[in-house]
Amino acid sequence: MKILLVGESSMLHNTLKKGLTERGHKVTLMSDGNDWHDSPRDIDLRRNMRWGKLSGLQVLWNIFSNLPKVCGNDIVQLHNYTFVPLLGGWNRIMFWFLKLTNKRIIKGCFADDPFLFEQQAAGVPAYSDTYWNNKPQNMEANRQRIFEHTRPQFIRCWHDVAYNSDALVACLYEYWLCYNTPRFAKRLHYIPLPMEIPHESSARIKGMGRTIKVLVGIQPKRDYLKGAMRIASFVESVARRHPGRIEIEYVEGVPYDKYMRMLDEADVLVDQLYSYTPSMNSLAAMARGTVVIGGGENDYYNFIGEPKLRPIINVRPDISDGENETTIEQAFFTEGQLQRMSRQSIEFTRKYHDYRCVAEQY
């Protein structure tokens, strides 16, 4: 098949392209590089802001100068309802252009959108980065983020894309929960995040030493979305009760290759407080045998049909700090528990997230 992937979210489309290409499909990836990630792409949609508003013309030129690749595809998958770095009105026009000139359009449910915020405000899922304990939370920190997606032109764009796509694909259980409504259920599919799994020799069982090495990735401007510093405070509290047994390293802004080496060396990674399920960052750690503190709700394991593996130290914002600390402490200091979770982490990523298996599901 001839396939066009538009937009990028944490290398999802790049990794999927590799899997689809290996299966014999002809795949083109068109994106702006996902901001600072600067991920690879075949058609570059990045705006050169030296040109101000005129930089949008460059984006349109790059699209229309590649019409043989942009048109006539069997499948076009959009990473979100806005998929080119232009305002909502232009995204709306581009959606209808792609729908008219290609056979099938898939909307990816991979990121923020107006419906996601509407569902979160109604308590779906039970907790998120904007809602827990039956009420909205973090609203001041999230005000601009929500505003960006709820302006009238963006709501109209979302409506056109969501209601007129041939299918919707959610990459996370919480996104699937939000879209599993009578309006979308018949067209909705869950397909997990694709990953290039490191060779078996790159993974090692963690938690074997006397000292537990904990890695905390810091994103100060985004911590209201992730909650990593709150989890780190839980770990610090546990560390004070066990002097000399826990070593915590904070890291910010290191190159990707160095960060991967740090994941290899760590026993435990602090990830996200507000998520139900593992993120791409979590999966990169788990594939290396590093145990993750983050989202691993039983509802998620039941949803994917996993009866045995429970590799994640599950923390959540809607319980007390003391309960979260107890969960971490038990995982760290119950004999053999970290090693078991490390083994299960490797098995879990290979079972559900190998990019070749994910490409087959697509």
Whereabouts are the PLM-identified features?
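Acceptor-binding helix/loop patch of EC 2.4 sugar-transfer enzymes
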Residues: S39, R46, K107-P152, K221, ...
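Membrane-proximal helix-turn-helix segments that form the acceptor-binding/catalytic region
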Residues: F64-C71, I93-L100, R104, T130-L168
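A short, active-site helix/loop in glycosyltransferases that binds the activated sugar's phosphate group
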Residues: F117, R145-L188, S233
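Conserved catalytic-core segment of nucleotide-activated headgroup transferases in glycan assembly
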Residues: W176-V254
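Short hydrophobic beta-strand element within catalytic cores of glycosyltransferases
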Residues: V291-Y300
